[in-house]
UniProtKB/Swiss-Prot annotation:
Full protein name: H/ACA ribonucleoprotein complex subunit DKC1
Gene Ontology terms describing biological process: box H/ACA sno(s)RNA 3'-end processing; enzyme-directed rRNA pseudouridine synthesis; mRNA pseudouridine synthesis; positive regulation of telomerase RNA localization to Cajal body; positive regulation of telomere maintenance via telomerase; protein localization to Cajal body; regulation of telomerase RNA localization to Cajal body; RNA processing
Oligomeric and partner information: Part of the H/ACA small nucleolar ribonucleoprotein (H/ACA snoRNP) complex, which contains NHP2/NOLA2, GAR1/NOLA1, NOP10/NOLA3, and DKC1/NOLA4, which is presumed to be the catalytic subunit. The complex contains a stable core formed by binding of one or two NOP10-DKC1 heterodimers to NHP2; GAR1 subsequently binds to this core via DKC1. The complex binds a box H/ACA small nucleolar RNA (snoRNA), which may target the specific site of modification within the RNA substrate. During assembly, the complex contains NAF1 instead of GAR1/NOLA1.
Lineage of the species this protein comes from: Eukaryota, Metazoa, Chordata, Craniata, Vertebrata
EC number: 5.4.99.-
Annotated phenotype, changing residue 56 to S: In DKCX; due to a 2 nucleotide inversion
GO cellular component: box H/ACA scaRNP complex; box H/ACA snoRNP complex; box H/ACA telomerase RNP complex; cytoplasm; fibrillar center; nucleolus; nucleoplasm; nucleus
Recorded name of the encoding gene: DKC1
Documented effect of changing residue 350 to T: In DKCX; decreases interaction with SHQ1
Keywords recorded for this protein, A-Z: Acetylation, Cataract, Cytoplasm, Deafness, Disease variant, Dyskeratosis congenita, Isomerase, Isopeptide bond, Nucleus, Phosphoprotein, Ribonucleoprotein, Ribosome biogenesis, RNA-binding, rRNA processing, Ubl conjugation
Amino acid sequence: MADAEVIILPKKHKKKKERKSLPEEDVAEIQHAEEFLIKPESKVAKLDTSQWPLLLKNFDKLNVRTTHYTPLACGSNPLKREIGDYIRTGFINLDKPSNPSSHEVVAWIRRILRVEKTGHSGTLDPKVTGCLIVCIERATRLVKSQQSAGKEYVGIVRLHNAIEGGTQLSRALETLTGALFQRPPLIAAVKRQLRVRTIYESKMIEYDPERRLGIFWVSCEAGTYIRTLCVHLGLLLGVGGQMQELRRVRSGVMSEKDHMVTMHDVLDAQWLYDNHKDESYLRRVVYPLEKLLTSHKRLVMKDSAVNAICYGAKIMLPGVLRYEDGIEVNQEIVVITTKGEAICMAIALMTTAVISTCDHGIVAKIKRVIMERDTYPRKWGLGPKASQKKLMIKQGLLDKHGKPTDSTPATWKQEYVDYSESAKKEVVAEVVKAPQVVAEAAKTAKRKRESESESDETPPAAPQLIKKEKKKSKKDKKAKAGLESGAEPGDGDSDTTKKKKKKKKAKEVELVSE
């Protein structure tokens, strides 16, 4: 029998089911309609997490510390807040018109929306147009962080004399990158001090040699004066130049492509809501403040820890559910709830590696609390000792502040440690110690100086000692003479006193006669 040839057929690879990415319109509808929440379970979400809204985007890629927590019904998804809260915790990406100042524009929006407080990130000069982020009420807490964010501009520079082609202008623009010295222009809203501002990138878009106009794009640090940059361009080219027109195309996270709205849009949206109760246009015009924080590293907290943070508690590791990769010490991060609401801005005190290895400790310190207090219920003071303390206050064994009284059991006094009092004592002790330490330091410094001066002094020569002895002997003689005269008062003393009186009288008479 001939050997039968065995033919091995190649295995069919099963194709992985690829999730079809939905069109943007459908995603927007789903985001506004459904409830989005990081649930205490490890099931895959229905909608791809890359299409989840705002700060919950790609939450499944965050490092998981624990999935166990008790969800609370309080709070809501930023996109599904009630219209009043939605506006009070929102911002507008406004296309600023030419001529009115930034402060005027912001005041008009405050009047249109009928809110108490508005603020803007990075002032634009009256003639400058473009991206102006207007923060409303609660969102004004983020103004500082947005003011210091990078900016992008498109400007037109007019040269005073002709140059050969646009290559010279593009070279000059490339030269004026990096850290530059700038003094604000003559007409400026700030003090005219020399300062350093960084230009990250710049490029020429177009140059018209007939009209001597150049269009350029600049990405720069906050507080850079483009007018001054245009003057410097003219000086560098040797022909002189000035800024003709300017538009801001990006401010921090928001650009002019991110649904920028005009003043008319805001006015129309408010009119529709007032007259037809249609809030859909207002929701398009105003964005939740969480959109400004999408570039920050995230830290997801348990619902039970949220209100404590709003009251200024330390961000401790047991309250953390998830954390992002690449967190560094002293980096600005955003602390969020499981529903994607921003609780506060914080400064990280642990890196991602330390968070993953530790089981206790302070993760970050609060920089700015964003969320309103008591949005979530209070969940502190529910431990065994705290519960016992509350019961004893009810029974009258402790006073209303939880301090021991005459009727307090001896066992409680011995066992219970009031950490708030111990902390106060430590602070008082430190305050008392501080002046003592300062006094001791001053004494030691004095001693050092004295010892140094003594060591620096040379031994005195013999003639100086002789002089000192002579002076002493003279003093002793005078003292003895004084004692003798004091012991035996004679007529001489009375004569001298009489003479003095006569002299005084004579002087007085002379003065009167003059």
